[in-house]
Every structure is written in structure tokens, then in C-alpha cells.
């Protein structure tokens, strides 16, 4: 709701980043557009903030693409509306590189972008507070993870361990589901269970 969006944007506004900060707040055409109105009213005169209202629901990915298309900085940080950041996150992310991250980071580097990992940069997020919200989140994440697996051909030329990690991360749950279905089928057909 509005309180989450306000907390997120306020945490970005308070960043101690010394460089030029541009913030694109994108409403992806959600059904709850009223949540962004108080945030817009509060930051409309702040030159660091731009508000983009998508005419129809396009989803997070396309909303992110719109914001990234408007960006011209060296550092692009994508934040969900339910995330709040500590004051030094942007400055720590903009500091000297210390370590390489995982597959999406390698793909970005391969495309010519510079990426940074700073272990001291901590963000907090709101966790689902109901089983339905949790299941929706997990379904969303599973779709995203499966889409990453479909991009495995992009990983093949980069790092075999990352490729195996990506495949294994999606193969495990599929094998678990197959195991449960097989067990239930055995129970239904033979009145025995394979794990006794």
C-alpha cells in the first residue's frame, strides 16, 4: 500500500550518495494507483524524482525497462516498492568493486556493464503476511527462475559451474514434485509407499 511505497521512496531520498541521484518511480499500471498519489505529492518538487505512470498493467519487468531506458548514470539500482534501504547503500554500491556475483551479474558484465558487490550494503524487505501472498510470491519467483533456466544457453559460454547451478536450482524442485507424484501413484495402485 501507500505506506510501503512511501517508506521505500523515503529510504531512497535519504541516501548519502555524493553523486547525482535520479530516481524513477514507476507505477506499472497496478490496480492500486492510489498508493503512489501521496508519494508523488510529497516528492513532485524534488528534482531528483520523476514519476512514470504506465497506462496499463505491464508488469515489473517492462516497468523496469522503462526506467532503465530513461537512466543515464553509471549505477542503476532497481528496487521493489516493498524494499527500504539503509542510508549508505548507494554510496557503498558505487564504491570500488570487491567481488563478482552470480549469473545475472556475469551476463551484465558480458554485455559491457560494470557491476559491484558490497557485503555491507543491506536492504530490508517486507515478507508476505499471509499464505496466499506467500504462494503468489513463490509462484512469481518460480516463473522468474524458470525463465532464467531457459536462458541457460547464454550461460554455457560463460561459466560451467554457474550453468550447472542454474539448472540444478530448477531441476531439484521438479524432481521433488515427480517423486511425490510417483509415491502417490504407487500408494493409489498398490496400497504401499516407496518411503516406508
From Swiss-Prot:
InterPro entries attached to this UniProt entry: Glyco_trans_2-like, Nucleotide-diphossugar_trans
Tagged with keyword Transferase: yes
EC id: 2.4.1.-
GO BP term, example: extracellular matrix assembly
Annotated SUPFAM superfamilies: Nucleotide-diphospho-sugar transferases (SSF53448)
Listed GO MF terms: hyaluronan synthase activity
Keywords recorded for this protein, A-Z: Cell membrane, Glycosyltransferase, Membrane, Nodulation, Plasmid, Transferase
Primary residence: membrane
Record's GO cellular component terms: plasma membrane
Subcellular location: Cell membrane
Tagged with keyword Oxidoreductase: no
Topology in the lipid bilayer: Peripheral membrane protein
Protein's job: Involved in the synthesis of Nod factor, a sulfated N-acyl-beta-1,4-tetrasaccharide of N-acetylglucosamine which initiates a series of events in the host plant species leading eventually to nodulation.
Family assignment from sequence similarity: Belongs to the NodC/HAS family.
PANTHER family tied to this protein: HYALURONAN SYNTHASE, MANNURONAN SYNTHASE
Identification of the protein by name: N-acetylglucosaminyltransferase
Protein's organism: Rhizobium sp. (strain MPIK3030)
Amino acid at each position: 500500500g501507500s505506506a510501503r511505497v512511501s517508506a521505500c521512496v523515503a529510504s531512497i531520498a535519504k541516501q548519502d550518495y555524493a553523486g547525482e541521484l535520479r530516481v524513477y518511480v514507476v507505477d506499472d499500471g497496478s490496480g492500486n494507483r492510489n498508493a503512489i498519489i501521496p508519494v508523488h505529492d510529497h516528492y513532485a518538487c524534488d528534482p531528483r524524482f520523476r514519476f512514470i505512470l504506465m497506462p496499463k498493467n505491464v508488469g515489473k519487468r517492462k516497468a523496469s525497462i522503462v526506467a532503465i531506458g530513461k537512466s543515464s548514470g553509471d549505477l542503476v539500482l532497481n528496487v521493489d516498492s516493498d524494499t527500504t534501504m539503509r542510508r549508505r547503500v548507494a554510496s557503498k554500491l558505487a564504491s570500488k568493486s570487491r567481488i563478482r556475483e552470480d549469473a545475472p551479474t556475469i551476463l551484465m558484465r558480458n554485455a559491457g556493464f560494470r557491476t559491484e558487490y558490497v557485503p555491507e550494503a543491506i536492504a530490508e524487505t517486507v515478507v508476505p503476511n499471509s499464505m496466499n501472498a506467500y504462494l503468489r510470491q513463490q509462484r512469481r519467483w518460480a516463473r522468474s527462475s524458470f525463465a532464467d533456466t531457459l536462458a541457460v544457453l547464454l550461460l554455457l559460454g560463460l561459466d560451467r559451474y554457474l550453468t550447472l547451478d542454474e539448472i540444478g536450482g530448477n531441476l531439484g524442485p521438479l524432481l521433488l514434485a515427480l517423486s511425490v507424484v510417483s509415491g502417490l501413484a504407487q500408494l493409489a495402485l498398490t496400497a504401499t509407499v516407496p518411503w516406508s
